[in-house]
């Protein structure tokens, strides 16, 4: 690794020259802008209309930049491994991680050989953003002064984490930074990580009141990660839903005939290989079969910001035919192999938005690049479907693929990909409903679900979760669904995780001698929990007690659960002692009394939604305005998810993830939908649409979606061309 300091004039000379009015490129932008109409509805949501798909993409990117250019740019700064250029040395190894997989030279070559139609869209993508910067000279990009079409390939799939983020920057620092820092381990009393994921439901016409397919879209993401948009062209594009900032396709959404919803999958879509490395002179080789192959060594440069100006670090990185080396384990170098098909991924991401039937949607799934996600589908023909993951390598089942495998053994090579038919898949199950909550597919449609014994172990690495249990409860016992009753099911307040936990706590209390001071201390709390219906509400004191008790117990025994390789939930219910359970309740009660004056504090007084600024990392303040939220963390089985905690300087808990864009859709001769987003459309605190959806968000009161142009009548705030 080498370090260099770049003189300021080098940095300035590398920056792109801003466009001028005399630039013929500007004339082209102006001409395209005249072919685009943006209609902002009374929630500030942009409905973009254009003759060609490319015109709509141009307008979409302009509208996104208007709403939150910072988030648009930041997503691509991160995707290209350039965070350290604005955030400094702390981001060096995050950037190195991205640069291991995202190489500008390679991306430019892939762009050059992309299909003409896709290149046209990528050009429109860059033009829309650059036109915004031209029209808004007061906006200073942090890093990307001019967007280039090839850059769209660096962020070609819409999920939050993706496969690359499975690589630990800490491990990269230990290996390439030559620092003996060890792997990060959770602290003994660390707060359990907030569950990620999403919910998707599809209800067949046979199980709905109007005999039309119903669809529930409920991604659980960090707040403000996606914007709500509509894209309409004269080339068959008419799509509505959530677009990840900076991308030109709707990721979770629907068109006039079909809808799709992605949930993070438990399928094993990547592998790590233990490479046996042999050094000969200054070169590295690795064993493969009976031979030794030369390891590829290349230089990656990571520029980073310092108080004195820009500097850079150069790393010599290594690769085998499996992929880049990401860490070392017991003397073996670990290579990672994952999907790297940006052109196909962008093709699939866009093409599915125009798929209006199951057959057409199924065809997009055959590109196999939606690697880390399951998909729920419904359409106006009455079809409902579940697709399990979309990139599952075929492997030799003799190996344990949950761990790194021997890279020197040719038998560990992938043998192609599993087809849709070879993967867990459902089409119109007899149950009349299907769902996924990031759990296994083997309960996706009740008795109609795929059978676990029909598939290799690597096809699904997870299991059931509390949301899955809850989903079956609300879907299997209800007939004649309507949009209203499906919303009610999705916001059902039951917390099934406490079905085992609360009885175990009460049993601990009942088995403790009456003379115990600990029993006396928690007697009133136990009486409340004994009569609790295990439903959340903003007025519920038992919800407060149960959540704080559960979190305290998790903190107390989390390390023990990990050491025994058990899930924390299983450990809580089966391995904790009566004293641990009661002690955790006493500790939680003391914490509540210290922070809020009494343990008898209603849940809504603690669990709050707040949006004070447009910062990507939000600040929170108990002195600022906020709203009560009834629904809890998904950890406890709440289908409506709200991941909240206290922050430095706060006692109240503020949410940063969970329900984000939420929608219910009814398909038929026409499409009807309702939706709500966390906060509002705009990232500007001065905008009336910064927080105008917050009350509806916290109460589950979805608003009407204006899908058809005539529905915008009397609901239009502004109609304009980009640049006006």
Go through each PLM region and give its residues.
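Bacterial N-terminal signal peptides
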Residues: 5-15
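Acidic, low-complexity N-terminal propeptides/linkers enriched in Ser/Thr/Asp/Gly that mediate export
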Residues: 118-216, 221-222, 368, 380-384, ...
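Glycine- and hydrophobic-rich flexible loops that cap the catalytic core of alpha/beta enzyme folds
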Residues: 236-247, 253-256, 262-405
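Hydrophobic alpha-helical segments
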Residues: 241, 370-478, 553
